[in-house]
Amino acid sequence: MKVILLKDVKSLGKKGDLVNASDGYARNYLIPKKLAEQATENNVHILNNKKEAERRQKLKELEEAQKLAKSLMGKEIKFKVKIGENGRLFGSITSKDISEKLKEQYNMNIDKKKIVAETIRQTGVYEAEIKIYPEVSTKVKVSVLEE
Protein backbone atom coordinates (compact mmCIF):
# COMPACT_ATOMS: atom_id res chain seq x y z
CA MET A 1 0.00 0.00 0.00
CA LYS A 2 1.32 3.45 -0.86
CA VAL A 3 1.24 5.93 2.02
CA ILE A 4 2.33 9.52 2.62
CA LEU A 5 4.32 9.90 5.83
CA LEU A 6 3.01 12.60 8.16
CA LYS A 7 5.96 12.23 10.55
CA ASP A 8 9.45 10.77 10.30
CA VAL A 9 9.32 6.96 10.57
CA LYS A 10 12.69 5.37 11.27
CA SER A 11 12.36 2.33 9.00
CA LEU A 12 10.46 4.04 6.14
CA GLY A 13 11.49 7.63 5.57
CA LYS A 14 10.99 11.28 6.41
CA LYS A 15 7.87 13.41 6.72
CA GLY A 16 6.29 14.09 3.33
CA ASP A 17 7.77 11.02 1.61
CA LEU A 18 5.58 8.80 -0.57
CA VAL A 19 6.51 5.21 0.36
CA ASN A 20 5.33 1.62 -0.04
CA ALA A 21 4.41 -0.14 3.20
CA SER A 22 2.84 -3.53 3.73
CA ASP A 23 -0.95 -3.38 3.97
CA GLY A 24 -1.08 -4.65 7.55
CA TYR A 25 1.66 -2.30 8.78
CA ALA A 26 -0.06 0.67 7.16
CA ARG A 27 -3.62 -0.17 8.29
CA ASN A 28 -2.81 -1.39 11.80
CA TYR A 29 0.05 0.88 12.82
CA LEU A 30 0.92 3.85 10.59
CA ILE A 31 -2.57 5.19 9.82
CA PRO A 32 -4.14 4.73 13.33
CA LYS A 33 -1.14 6.39 14.99
CA LYS A 34 -1.34 9.31 12.51
CA LEU A 35 2.16 8.57 11.23
CA ALA A 36 0.90 8.24 7.65
CA GLU A 37 -2.15 8.62 5.45
CA GLN A 38 -3.24 6.62 2.45
CA ALA A 39 -1.80 7.94 -0.81
CA THR A 40 -4.99 8.77 -2.69
CA GLU A 41 -4.81 10.84 -5.85
CA ASN A 42 -6.05 13.90 -3.95
CA ASN A 43 -3.54 13.47 -1.09
CA VAL A 44 -0.65 13.07 -3.53
CA HIS A 45 -1.77 16.24 -5.34
CA ILE A 46 -1.90 18.15 -2.03
CA LEU A 47 1.57 16.82 -1.11
CA ASN A 48 3.01 17.94 -4.45
CA ASN A 49 1.50 21.42 -4.01
CA LYS A 50 3.03 21.71 -0.52
CA LYS A 51 6.45 20.64 -1.78
CA GLU A 52 6.28 23.14 -4.65
CA ALA A 53 5.27 25.94 -2.25
CA GLU A 54 8.19 25.04 0.07
CA ARG A 55 10.59 25.03 -2.88
CA ARG A 56 9.38 28.47 -4.00
CA GLN A 57 9.66 29.80 -0.43
CA LYS A 58 13.25 28.56 -0.13
CA LEU A 59 14.16 30.16 -3.46
CA LYS A 60 12.63 33.44 -2.31
CA GLU A 61 14.55 33.29 0.99
CA LEU A 62 17.77 32.50 -0.89
CA GLU A 63 17.29 35.51 -3.21
CA GLU A 64 16.62 37.80 -0.23
CA ALA A 65 19.71 36.46 1.54
CA GLN A 66 21.83 37.10 -1.56
CA LYS A 67 20.51 40.69 -1.79
CA LEU A 68 21.31 41.25 1.88
CA ALA A 69 24.79 39.78 1.43
CA LYS A 70 25.41 42.08 -1.53
CA SER A 71 24.30 45.14 0.46
CA LEU A 72 26.53 44.15 3.41
CA MET A 73 29.61 43.51 1.28
CA GLY A 74 32.29 46.12 1.86
CA LYS A 75 30.54 47.71 4.84
CA GLU A 76 32.66 48.87 7.75
CA ILE A 77 31.48 48.94 11.33
CA LYS A 78 33.28 51.44 13.55
CA PHE A 79 33.56 51.19 17.30
CA LYS A 80 34.99 54.04 19.36
CA VAL A 81 35.90 52.66 22.76
CA LYS A 82 37.94 53.53 25.80
CA ILE A 83 41.18 51.63 26.01
CA GLY A 84 43.66 50.87 28.74
CA GLU A 85 47.32 49.95 28.57
CA ASN A 86 48.81 48.33 25.45
CA GLY A 87 45.75 49.16 23.34
CA ARG A 88 43.54 46.71 25.24
CA LEU A 89 39.85 47.46 25.63
CA PHE A 90 37.92 47.65 28.85
CA GLY A 91 35.69 44.64 28.17
CA SER A 92 35.39 43.24 24.66
CA ILE A 93 33.44 43.49 21.42
CA THR A 94 31.30 40.43 20.68
CA SER A 95 28.93 39.36 17.91
CA LYS A 96 26.09 40.92 19.91
CA ASP A 97 27.82 44.32 19.79
CA ILE A 98 28.43 43.93 16.05
CA SER A 99 24.75 43.10 15.53
CA GLU A 100 23.69 46.20 17.48
CA LYS A 101 26.10 48.43 15.50
CA LEU A 102 24.74 47.08 12.19
CA LYS A 103 21.26 48.05 13.37
CA GLU A 104 22.47 51.48 14.52
CA GLN A 105 24.68 52.39 11.53
CA TYR A 106 22.93 50.69 8.60
CA ASN A 107 19.45 49.86 9.96
CA MET A 108 19.96 46.13 9.29
CA ASN A 109 18.57 43.53 11.66
CA ILE A 110 21.01 40.64 11.77
CA ASP A 111 20.77 37.99 14.47
CA LYS A 112 23.91 37.77 16.62
CA LYS A 113 23.97 33.99 16.10
CA LYS A 114 24.61 34.54 12.39
CA ILE A 115 27.74 36.60 13.05
CA VAL A 116 30.98 34.64 13.32
CA ALA A 117 33.72 36.77 14.83
CA GLU A 118 36.44 36.33 17.37
CA THR A 119 36.03 38.25 20.60
CA ILE A 120 37.81 41.55 20.02
CA ARG A 121 39.91 42.87 22.91
CA GLN A 122 42.34 45.27 21.20
CA THR A 123 42.18 48.19 18.81
CA GLY A 124 42.62 47.46 15.12
CA VAL A 125 40.75 46.29 12.04
CA TYR A 126 39.12 42.87 12.09
CA GLU A 127 36.86 40.84 9.82
CA ALA A 128 33.55 39.33 10.86
CA GLU A 129 31.72 36.75 8.78
CA ILE A 130 27.94 36.94 8.58
CA LYS A 131 26.24 33.67 7.65
CA ILE A 132 22.90 34.88 6.32
CA TYR A 133 21.67 31.59 4.84
CA PRO A 134 23.30 28.12 4.74
CA GLU A 135 25.00 28.79 1.38
CA VAL A 136 25.18 32.60 1.63
CA SER A 137 27.71 34.47 3.74
CA THR A 138 29.60 37.73 3.53
CA LYS A 139 32.32 39.55 5.43
CA VAL A 140 32.31 42.99 7.01
CA LYS A 141 35.16 45.05 8.45
CA VAL A 142 35.13 45.84 12.13
CA SER A 143 37.27 48.85 13.07
CA VAL A 144 38.04 49.41 16.72
CA LEU A 145 39.31 52.93 17.40
CA GLU A 146 40.40 54.76 20.52
CA GLU A 147 37.82 57.18 21.87
Curated annotation (Swiss-Prot):
PROSITE patterns: RIBOSOMAL_L9. SUPFAM superfamilies: L9 N-domain-like, Ribosomal protein L9 C-domain. It comes from the Bacteria. GO terms for cellular component: ribonucleoprotein complex; ribosome. GO terms for biological process: translation. Keywords: Ribonucleoprotein, Ribosomal protein, RNA-binding, rRNA-binding. GO terms for molecular function: rRNA binding; structural constituent of ribosome. The keyword RNA-binding applies. HAMAP family: Ribosomal_bL9. Binds to the 23S rRNA. Belongs to the bacterial ribosomal protein bL9 family. This is Large ribosomal subunit protein bL9. The gene is rplI.
